[in-house]
Regions:
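Active-site loop segments of alpha/beta catalytic cores
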Residues: 1-48, 52-54, 76, 83-92, ...
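N-terminal glycine-rich cofactor-binding segment that shapes the pocket for flavin-like pterin cofactors
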Residues: 58-71, 78, 90-133, 140
Length: 251
């Protein structure tokens, strides 16, 4: 990761931000400035508090409440100083299968995650898969992102959502258990479905990245490791359901 297009970012909760970024960039190059990067994270640390505080019992309402999501995060970092390479990052989150929702799948919401209702019940349903950039989930992610951008200056970084194209998206469309069977019974159809699930990735990524870069934000998501350039975390959670040669071949 070469240090290019570097700009100054002042964060009141992280006075050592610039040096922390230099350590991260050095680590990617296999080098050390003064020590390796160190960070401290408790994933979903404030979820229980958020659940108790929300006035409605409708989980979808809570996930979709942009003001509440941003305010909850801000309260969670009040009075804190971020040490080492632990960065204060808010990233808009509608669940790991939201990528499938961009094509028409409906999401159901739980306390800490969401999941897709299978959209491709029959192989003929593949013809229905079209990216909709005006989709309810894309519009909501934009709203949450903009809400955070309005309040982040000097306080925290704003990132982009957890994107799972490819195999994970195909599994969300088809149902993970069914896709396991499909890999045995219809491997060519599976391959074609995965191709559809990844072909629009750059368009989707660029949509969110452009919005962040317009506001001089870095590229960062759930992992909490920022980049001044373009950064994405490749994901294939579905691989945990597969073993042997099929797993190695399709991953």
């Amino acid at each position: 990761m070469v240090q290019t297009d570097w700009w100054t970012l002042e964060l009141e909760s992280m006075p050592g931000f610039d040096l922390a970024m230099k350590r991260v960039y050095a680590w990617f190059e296999g080098a050390i400035i003064d020590r390796p990067p160190v960070r401290f994270m408790a994933h979903n640390a404030f979820v229980d508090q958020a659940n108790q505080a929300y006035p409605s019992g409708d989980l979808r309402d809570r996930w979709f409440d942009a003001e509440f999501q941003v305010e909850t995060f801000i309260k969670s970092i009040e009075g804190q100083t971020f040490h080492g390479e632990t960065f204060p990052v808010f990233w808009p989150n509608l669940g790991p299968e939201v990528y499938a929702g961009f094509y028409g799948a409906e999401l159901q919401y739980g306390e800490v995650t969401s999941w897709s209702i299978p959209l491709v019940r029959d192989w003929d349903d593949v013809a229905r898969l079209k990216l909709d950039m005006d989709n309810v989930y894309l519009r909501k992610l934009d709203e949450i992102t903009r809400c955070a951008l309005e309040r982040c200056a000097g306080r925290f970084l704003v990132g982009y959502t957890d994107l799972h194209p490819g195999v994970d998206c195909a599994a969300a469309w088809r149902d993970p258990q069914q896709l396991c069977m499909d890999m045995i019974e219809a491997p060519e159809r599976v391959k074609a479905l995965i191709e559809i699930a990844i072909r629009d990735f750059e368009t989707i990524y660029d949509h969110f990245d452009s919005l962040l870069k317009e506001h001089r934000q870095l590229s960062v998501s759930w992992m909490g490791i920022p980049s001044f350039g373009r950064m994405h975390i490749p994901s294939c959670d579905f691989s945990s359901l597969k073993i042997g040669r099929a797993s190695c071949r399709d991953r």
